[in-house]
Amino acid sequence: MEEVAEEVPVVYLHDVKRQYVQGESILTILNGAKLALWAGQSVALVAPSGAGKSTLLHIAGLLEHPDEGEVYVGGTATSGLSDAERTQIRRTDIGFVYQSHRLLPEFSALENVMLPQMIRGLKRSETTERAKEILAYLGLGDRITHRPAELSGGEQQRVAIARAVANAPRVLLADEPTGNLDVHTADHVFQALMQLVRATQVAMLIATHNMELAGRMDRRVSIQDGLVVELD
């Protein structure tokens, strides 16, 4: 089925400010930051360590509140929502991939991908079918019964990606998803991410130090003086 791009950003950060207390001083990480993520678009977030990449991802993913400003998801302001409402949006609209796969070691690849769907209350038969479909799409159809310890690093990350998109989110947020992988494996994982963006029209924001991979994405942004700036 042909996807139609949304008229509003999937996620929009407007004038976001975030500060932390550091000893007796205040450290300003974001100060008036703006960022729009659109359906079907991949965005690389490249900045030095400590510049605020993880903070930006956490705020965009509703894991952290900004001190000022607003985060819109699908055009809806989130600042006035309850914790339960924010959690519901994270479960349905936002997928996360981390540098460490964070898979549950006692579960198989299939069960790890089924879990987010079961938390939403979907039937086991539905979750099983969708999990198998996603894993097969990512080239893991013959590895679904294996536990994380029985998989390679690249396979573990592809299972983590499958888990992140299990609930068909609007946006995928990834924090250094290839940081622990060798160049060849990192390329395979990156291709899997881009394949999903094209197939599902999910918006994707990846924090990365890998400039070669960043150069293959639709947009590149950085954080400078608390602002999100477009590169190129």
Swiss-Prot record:
CDD domains: ABC_MJ0796_LolCDE_FtsE. ATP binds at A47, P48, S49, G50, A51, G52, K53, S54. One of its GO terms (biological process) is protein localization to outer membrane. Keywords: ATP-binding, Cell inner membrane, Cell membrane, Membrane, Nucleotide-binding, Translocase, Transport. It is a peripheral membrane protein. Residues 11-231 form the ABC transporter domain. It holds the Pfam family ABC_tran. It is an enzyme of class 7 (translocase). Its EC number is 7.6.2.-. One of its GO terms (molecular function) is ATP hydrolysis activity. One of its GO terms (cellular component) is plasma membrane. It is found in: Cell inner membrane. Part of the ABC transporter complex LolCDE involved in the translocation of mature outer membrane-directed lipoproteins, from the inner membrane to the periplasmic chaperone, LolA. Responsible for the formation of the LolA-lipoprotein complex in an ATP-dependent manner. The complex is composed of two ATP-binding proteins (LolD) and two transmembrane proteins (LolC and LolE). Belongs to the ABC transporter superfamily. Lipoprotein translocase (TC 3.A.1.125) family. This is Lipoprotein-releasing system ATP-binding protein LolD 1. It comes from Rhodopseudomonas palustris (strain BisB18). The lineage of its organism: Bacteria, Pseudomonadati, Pseudomonadota, Alphaproteobacteria, Hyphomicrobiales. The gene is lolD1.
